[in-house]
């Protein structure tokens, strides 16, 4: 039962990432860095910080939502691909900015989210 819930939550997170990514790409059609994945990862980290700070004792809910949904919503693999693509295109500065903003933003986002719930 937990495996099915985990798969469904991961699927929902992935579909939401796909939808939001398309919305962001339509809003910012030619960004200098991959803004959509960066925003999604920061937003997902922020929301995960809020979720973790709720202190939910139910291990199943924590795994399904924390790992399933947020694991499907955020994406380290696409972030890695995009950073390497920028490097391969000899856009070293853009890659460095993308990596720095995504990593600092995601960690800072998680911290900020975790601070919202005392």
From Swiss-Prot:
Na(+) is not transported, but it plays an essential structural role and its presence is essential for fluoride channel function. It is a multi-pass membrane protein. Na(+) binds at residues 71, 74. Its main location: membrane. GO terms for molecular function: fluoride channel activity; metal ion binding. The chain crosses the membrane at residues 1-21, 36-56, 61-81, 97-117. It is found in: Cell membrane. One of its GO terms (biological process) is cellular detoxification of fluoride. It catalyses: fluoride(in) = fluoride(out). HAMAP family: FluC (MF_00454). Fluoride-specific ion channel. Important for reducing fluoride concentration in the cell, thus reducing its toxicity. Belongs to the fluoride channel Fluc/FEX (TC 1.A.43) family. NCBIfam families: crcB, PRK14213.1. This is Fluoride-specific ion channel FluC 1. It comes from Bacillus licheniformis (strain ATCC 14580 / DSM 13 / JCM 2505 / CCUG 7422 / NBRC 12200 / NCIMB 9375 / NCTC 10341 / NRRL NRS-1264 / Gibson 46).
């Amino acid at each position: 039962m937990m495996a099915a819930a985990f798969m469904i939550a991961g699927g929902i997170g992935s579909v939401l990432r796909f939808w939001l990514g398309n919305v962001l790409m339509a809003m910012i059609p030619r960004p200098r860095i991959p803004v959509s994945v960066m925003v999604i990862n920061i937003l997902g980290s922020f929301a995960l910080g809020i979720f973790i700070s709720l202190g939910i004792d139910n291990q199943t809910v924590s795994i399904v939502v924390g790992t399933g949904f947020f694991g499907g919503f955020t994406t380290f693999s696409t972030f890695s691909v995009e950073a390497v693509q920028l490097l391969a295109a000899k856009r070293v500065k853009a890659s460095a900015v993308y990596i720095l903003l995504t990593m600092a933003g995601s960690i800072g986002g998680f911290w900020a989210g975790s601070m919202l719930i005392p």
